[in-house]
């Protein structure tokens, strides 16, 4: 009898009696798409019993997932916020923009097959121009070289491959691969979407994915756990999205850093599984490691609807391991009464500027935001479920019944081929098209900047509103003057009808085709399709049985794919008299460090994509973007050109950064590029978690000012000495600053390196360290 499961009661989900070792010793496959990969609740329960005996305290659900996946539950040091956990994830998932570099790195490891189940999803390289099928056909043509590389490499290395048009990675994962209590890493920052099915799904850089695909344990600093207790029940215009919009306003873009957000309380049971996914998805915007919901009936219903009832039944047996213990302690607790929660709109330019709808009109006026709404966009990995589309269609139908349509431009991005086919069958797609919607491909599209926007000129101030998750400057359309707001699909549709930000559907009236006033009815929609899901077109490629004869060709003349050369090892010396490439002022996201949009096509070619290094960052010296002074010539040039000039002369350099440097996407290119162009260290007030790890993996030094105020003391034109020989666990490092005018001074720097990560730096990268051990 397993003690963890012996505590199980009949309280949850119809579970009856107690679970024994025999109850958990079953072969239930993780997914319908693979054979021989099983959910190992028995091993997870055994690991939890070992950890419980050691810690002797109640555990949060997040802790249960992590500790049940420990590589060494007997010997692992466990202290929230301090220890580095070595974990064994159940799965790895990559999207096509990050998969290229991950697979190129995996190839260099020389292994015949991935050691952990993995999938690749083609969703990032499809640009929104004319509409779904035409855009997909164009993407297949211009990205053929990359898709062929991914298809053949996946076949070669035993990786499941989801073709272009299949849908957005996170929707596909929720529909097919996520399971309660599992641990998955994904090379996309919105991987936490899987928390909607009770899975700890964590965004990582490609180098982390390579480690796990190669069979190594994955390292994660033991997160703190922030509890969000939900009470009451939502109604009317309030949607699940409003919960995370509210939480983002409370915690801000860095308030969740180093923590898992764990939702609990009676209010959880009123949310759909996909609604919970929405909330977890956007937890990435507050810096959270991931977000989770405990297993409940809504998750079971979703598993059943997606033809995975056997997983739901197995989860009911393991129910005790899929919820927090009574009296579990949280490092911070937030309470939200859903009965009182208002719809929210967040933005512009940052996802944590939260405004309830009742105050939004006033905020528009006070801040002089452009009130005319140019475009409304629904869909994306955050909000493209059947429930989202049904509720949006109900509002659109209400408008059509009154003889009016969308006043603003309106786009719809289905999250997957399954969603597209199902809403086509059930009529929501037709309603949204009649309303004026342009149906885009089942892909990321405008959410990640894959949008060939024509209705405004560059630098023309305008407003758009979307159901997306991220609204940084220029992210959607490369126009820094676009004021982008994020909200629920419901409010997007409502404001699109009005054509203005100065509309509150809870209080304001519209005019029908005859000039009569009316109010929109609150949205309605089923969480799951009554007639089941329609899978639509077959978009999956399984690895073949015979993989030995498959060859993965990369042309040496390709401008999109490039075989990687190992980075040089550290020379063992302090770096003296080196320049500051740029002192970044204000928000510096991974979009600023390595832009997406038109640059996505170079994600498999490190040298070419390095031509966008930090071109979006603001130079504190002159307030300009992509204009820095070469200390040798005294001339101003672009950031990449200046970095290349230093590299050609064998001169390493550093970057000075502000708060939460590297927030946003998980793209490891933002760490690979500075390393490739000769960078040695990034020194900031603070880092976003994924980017800090990515820099370490590539052999760079992510360092923080021991006193954040020292950021202001560093002249952008100063030369510096970096005492690399001081690098040791838990010890500060010294930065000696030599201003052009004035005396030199020392600044103390902090870091989070452990012993194994220091080896990455010494060897030149984590991949070099892996190769060295394999020799």
Swiss-Prot record:
Keyword check for 4Fe-4S: yes
EC number(s) stated in the UniProt entry for this protein:
4.2.1.3
Ligand binding (substrate) = 95, 188-190, 470, 475, 603, 666-667
Task: Specify the domain of life of the species encoding this protein.
Answer: Eukaryota
UniProt-listed Gene3D superfamilies: Aconitase, Domain 2, Aconitase, domain 3, Aconitase, domain 4
Task: Provide the cofactor note recorded for this chain's UniProt entry.
Answer: Binds 1 [4Fe-4S] cluster per subunit. Binding of a [3Fe-4S] cluster leads to an inactive enzyme.
Q: Where is the transit peptide?
A: 1-25
Localization recorded for this chain is: Mitochondrion
Pfam families in the cross-refs? Aconitase (PF00330), Aconitase_C (PF00694)
Q: In which pathway does it act?
A: Carbohydrate metabolism; tricarboxylic acid cycle; isocitrate from oxaloacetate: step 2/2
| GO biological process: one example | tricarboxylic acid cycle
**Which residues are tagged as glycosylated in the record?**
337, 383, 471, 608, 754, 763
Question: Which InterPro entries would you find in this protein's record?
Answer: Acnase/IPM_dHydase_lsu_aba_1/3 (IPR015931), Acoase/IPM_deHydtase_lsu_aba (IPR001030), Aconitase/3IPM_dehydase_swvl (IPR015928), Aconitase/IPM_isomerase (IPR050926), Aconitase_4Fe-4S_BS (IPR018136), Aconitase_4Fe-4S_dom (IPR036008), Aconitase_dom2 (IPR015932), Aconitase_mito-like (IPR006248)
Q: Which cofactor does it need?
A: [4Fe-4S] cluster
Biological function: Catalyzes the isomerization of citrate to isocitrate via cis-aconitate.
What is the protein's quaternary organization?
A: Monomer.
Q: What is this protein called?
A: Aconitate hydratase, mitochondrial
Organism of origin is Arthroderma benhamiae (strain ATCC MYA-4681 / CBS 112371) (Trichophyton mentagrophytes)
Taxonomic placement: Eukaryota, Fungi, Dikarya, Ascomycota, Pezizomycotina
């Amino acid at each position: 009898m397993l003690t963890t499961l012996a505590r199980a009661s009949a309280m949850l989900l119809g579970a009856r009696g107690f679970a024994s070792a025999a109850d958990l010793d079953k072969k239930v496959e993780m997914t319908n798409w693979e054979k021989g990969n099983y959910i190992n609740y028995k091993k997870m329960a055994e690991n939890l019993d070992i950890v419980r005996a050691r810690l002797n305290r109640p555990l949060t659900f997040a802790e249960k997932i992590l500790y049940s996946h420990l590589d060494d539950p007997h010997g692992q040091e466990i202290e929230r916020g301090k220890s580095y956990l070595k974990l064994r994830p159940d799965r790895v998932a990559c999207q096509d923009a990050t998969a290229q570099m991950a697979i190129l790195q995996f190839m260099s490891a020389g292994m015949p097959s991935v050691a952990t189940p993995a999938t690749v999803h083609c969703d990032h390289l499809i640009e929104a121009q004319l509409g779904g099928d035409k855009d997909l056909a164009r993407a297949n043509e211009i990205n053929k070289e990359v898709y062929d590389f991914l298809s053949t490499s996946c076949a070669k290395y035993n990786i499941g491959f989801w073709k272009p048009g299949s849908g957005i990675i996170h929707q596909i994962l929720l529909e097919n691969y996520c399971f309660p209590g599992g641990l998955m890493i994904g090379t996309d920052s919105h991987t936490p979407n899987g928390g909607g099915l009770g899975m700890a799904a964590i965004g990582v850089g490609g180098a982390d994915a390579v480690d796990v695909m190669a069979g190594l344990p994955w390292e994660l600093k033991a997160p703190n756990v922030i509890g969000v207790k939900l009470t009451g029940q939502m109604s009317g215009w309030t949607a699940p999205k409003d919960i995370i919009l509210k939480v983002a306003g409370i915690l801000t873009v860095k308030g969740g850093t180093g923590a898992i957000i764990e939702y609990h309380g009676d209010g959880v049971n009123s949310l759909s599984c996909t609604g919970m996914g929405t909330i977890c998805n956007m937890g990435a915007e507050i810096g959270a490691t991931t977000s989770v919901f405990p297993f409940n009936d809504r998750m079971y219903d979703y598993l059943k609807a997606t033809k995975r009832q056997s997983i739901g039944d197995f989860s009911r047996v393991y129910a005790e391991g899929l919820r927090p213990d009574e009296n579990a302690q949280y490092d911070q607790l937030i309470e939200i009464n859903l009965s009182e929660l208002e719809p929210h709109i967040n933005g512009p330019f940052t996802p944590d500027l939260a405004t309830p709808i009742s105050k939004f009109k006033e905020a528009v006026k006070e801040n002089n935001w452009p009130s005319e709404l140019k475009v409304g966009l629904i869909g994306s990995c955050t909000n493209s479920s059947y429930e989202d589309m049904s509720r949006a269609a109900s509002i659109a139908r209400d408008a059509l019944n009154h003889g009016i349509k969308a006043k603003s431009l309106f786009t719809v991005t289905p999250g997957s081929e399954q969603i597209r086919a199902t809403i086509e069958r059930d009529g929501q797609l037709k309603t949204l098209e009649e309303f004026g919607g342009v149906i885009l491909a089942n892909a990321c599209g405008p959410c990640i900047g894959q949008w060939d926007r024509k209705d405004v000129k560059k630098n023309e101030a305008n407003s758009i509103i979307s159901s997306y998750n991220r609204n940084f400057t220029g992210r959607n359309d490369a126009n820094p003057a676009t004021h982008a707001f994020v909200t629920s699909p419901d409010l997007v549709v409502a404001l699109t009808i009005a054509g203005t930000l100065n509309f509150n559907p809870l209080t304001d009236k519209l005019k029908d085709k005859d000039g009569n006033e009316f109010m929109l009815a609150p949205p309605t929609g089923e969480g799951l399709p009554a007639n089941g899901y329609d899978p639509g077109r077959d978009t999956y490629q399984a690895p073949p049985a015979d993989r030995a004869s498959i060859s993965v060709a990369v042309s040496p003349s390709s401008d999109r794919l490039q075989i990687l050369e190992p980075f040089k090892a550290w020379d063992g010396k302090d770096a003296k008299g080196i320049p500051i490439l740029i002192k970044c002022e204000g928000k510096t996201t991974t979009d600023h460090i390595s832009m997406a949009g038109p640059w996505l096509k170079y994600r498999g070619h490190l040298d070419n994509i390095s031509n966008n290094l930090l071109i979006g960052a603001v130079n504190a010296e002159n307030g300009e973007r992509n204009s820095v002074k070469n200390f040798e010539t005294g001339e101003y040039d672009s950031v990449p050109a200046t970095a290349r000039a230093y590299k050609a002369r064998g001169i390493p350099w550093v970057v000075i950064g502000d708060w939460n440097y590297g927030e946003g996407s998980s793209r490891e290119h933002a760490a690979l590029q500075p390393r490739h162009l000769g960078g040695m260290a990034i020194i900031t007030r603070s880092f976003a978690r994924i980017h800090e790890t990515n820099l370490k993996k590539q052999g760079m030094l992510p360092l923080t000012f021991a006193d954040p105020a020292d950021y202001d003391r560093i002249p952008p034109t100063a030369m510096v000495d970096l005492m690399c020989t001081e690098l040791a666990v838990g010890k500060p490092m010294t930065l000696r600053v030599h201003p052009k005018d004035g005396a030199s001074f020392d600044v103390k720097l902090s870091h989070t390196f452990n012993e194994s990560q220091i080896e990455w730096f010494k060897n030149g990268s984590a991949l070099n360290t892996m190769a060295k051990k394999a020799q």
